[in-house]
């Protein structure tokens, strides 16, 4: 009887430990995954003739998506990424959203002024608010009724345009649709490909997204970046005060000042958090560089300055200082 009681108690302990382990696994948050957008590779679009009218060096993604093979390949690659848990931003939806963005007409200065220029690709990544771009290119070789297709995919950080990873694959010669040939080629390397993306994104979560900021002095600004100002009882130059703000707000104080004149101040390798505080006590929300740097406008107003910010893509922003 005593042995039976001991065995029963041991069973209860085992079941309790299993239940606790199961509850912990259920409550454990899932790993965050970056938002992906699949796009045809820029060089591939140009080589295939999918370019803007009158500008043979600028890809036209709208034209590319009118091609059935391109559309099928992008749709299939997006589906493969979604199956692995990656949120997907649709390229066509982003293009449509960009066309409907009326604020773009007011935000930027023309190239002739030598000021802030945002090309269409920067506009696209800003509107899409995607973390990673998956560029895809393919070459079809025909053998009678059969096709063999070579694919090239690269992952790009949307904020910096730096390559994260890249893979190539080749299908067997087959009469199957191009989407099936893509799947055959990609499945051999997809784990390595998505693994490099996930490692990069986990670094962004831990150490911040990388970007750049350029400060400029407007004609009506009463100060230059060499002007002396007072802050917290200390005296220093305006550029030093901006350095102070950057050090206080970047992730781990990570940034590099890579250029300074009286009227221009630039920073690279600026690590800013993926999420910022929501207004009015709201939930944290995903931010781009413009969202990160915008609070400096209030900080600089104490020196009699009016400050405006303009985003370029998701990883770059211009900050213009003027007089009140």
Name the predicted role of every residue range:
Residues 20-35, 40-48, 162-254, 313:
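C-terminal/domain-edge helix-coil "capping" segments
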Residues 291-324:
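C-terminal basic regulatory modules in eukaryotic proteins
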Residues 131-175, 318-323:
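Amphipathic beta-strand/beta-sheet edge segments enriched in Tyr/Trp
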Residues 41-44, 93-94, 139-141, 154-159, ...:
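Solvent-exposed coil/turn segments that connect beta secondary-structure elements
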Residues 1-23:
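Bacterial Sec-dependent N-terminal signal peptides
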Residues 50-127, 133, 236-275, 281-302:
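N-terminal segment of the mature soluble domain
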Residues 94-112, 156-178:
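Short, flexible helix-coil linker/hinge segments at the edges of structured domains or between repeats
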Residues 32-34, 84, 129-134, 147-152, ...:
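Envelope-exposed proteins and targeting segments
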